[in-house]
């Protein structure tokens, strides 16, 4: 499986009720998944936990057979080889502009990455 969630909970400080509770799912590489539900049901919280932008309070998230989140242990978002595009987008605030641009440039030489970053910065 490419993505596996096992009994994932997401909790926000000061909130009695979890934003996400006991979610389990699996997706194979190339498979498309859809999250639907009313506003406030936890869709964005779950996606943020998968992307590493929110810690999980229980359960675990596995990407490409590697555990990337579980209670007390979360791989940084830039090490997950995935990202999200939000309606109100933002960059990774802890990365430089160049590193934000390079985030999606996997499998390229440093020279090719530098060239692409320079190209994008000229736009």
Go through each PLM region and give its residues.
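Conserved structural motif at the start of ABC-family nucleotide-binding domains
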Residues: 3, 18-20
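ABC-type ATPase nucleotide-binding domains, specifically the catalytic core motifs of the NBD
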Residues: 13-14, 95-113
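The feature captures the beta-strand-to-loop junction immediately N-terminal to the Walker
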Residues: 36-38
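Helix-to-loop junction immediately C-terminal to a conserved catalytic motif
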Residues: 51
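ABC nucleotide-binding domain "signature motif"
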Residues: 57-68
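Conserved ABC ATPase "signature" region
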Residues: 66-70, 111-123
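ABC ATPase NBD coupling module
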Residues: 67-83, 107
């Amino acid at each position: 499986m490419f993505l596996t969630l096992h009994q994932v909970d997401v909790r926000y400080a000061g909130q009695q009720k979890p934003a996400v509770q006991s979610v389990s799912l699996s997706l194979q590489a190339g498979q498309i998944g859809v999250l639907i539900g009313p506003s406030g049901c936890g869709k964005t919280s779950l996606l943020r936990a998968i992307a590493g932008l929110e810690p999980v309070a229980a359960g675990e998230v596995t990407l490409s057979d590697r555990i990337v989140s579980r209670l007390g242990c979360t791989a940084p978002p830039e090490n997950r080889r995935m990202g999200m595009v939000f309606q109100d987008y933002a960059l990774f605030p802890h990365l430089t502009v160049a590193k934000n641009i390079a985030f999606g440039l996997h499998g390229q030489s440093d020279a090719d990455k530098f060239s692409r970053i320079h190209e994008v910065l000229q736009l």
